[in-house]
């Protein structure tokens, strides 16, 4: 992906400031790798519930190995499973924790796929 962005920058004169990468879970960290490996600072990266296992637990990975605020001019992160399968600590310029960052959503008291579907929670 980094090589493709470099190609776009050289062949089409796309400004790196205009590039916005969005990634979910492991994809959020992949977006961070891309931001770390391109020759110029990307404009924005959005991390949607960056993966926690192997990145924050059992120990915190170095910033070169995960999404962090140095990967783009602006990094925003939305934490919706913070502390379980998603990163708990803030790692962007702006970190949002809707409903406290937990997977438990209002109106959905029991966490099971069957309940979530029957209660129209997804």
What does each model-identified segment do?
Residues 1-122:
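Serine-dependent carboxylesterase/thioesterase catalytic core
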């Amino acid at each position: 992906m980094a090589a493709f962005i470099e190609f776009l920058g050289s062949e089409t004169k796309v400004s790196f400031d205009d590039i916005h990468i969005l990634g979910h879970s492991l994809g959020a960290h992949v977006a961070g790798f891309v931001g770390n490996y391109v020759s110029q600072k990307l404009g924005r990266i959005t991390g949607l519930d960056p993966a926690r296992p192997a990145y924050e637990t059992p120990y915190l990975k170095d910033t070169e190995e995960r999404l962090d605020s140095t990967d783009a001019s602006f990094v925003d992160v939305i934490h919706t499973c913070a502390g379980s399968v998603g990163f708990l600590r803030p790692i962007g310029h702006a970190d949002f924790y809707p409903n406290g960052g937990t997977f438990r959503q209002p109106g959905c008291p029991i966490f099971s796929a069957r309940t979530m579907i029957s209660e129209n929670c997804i």
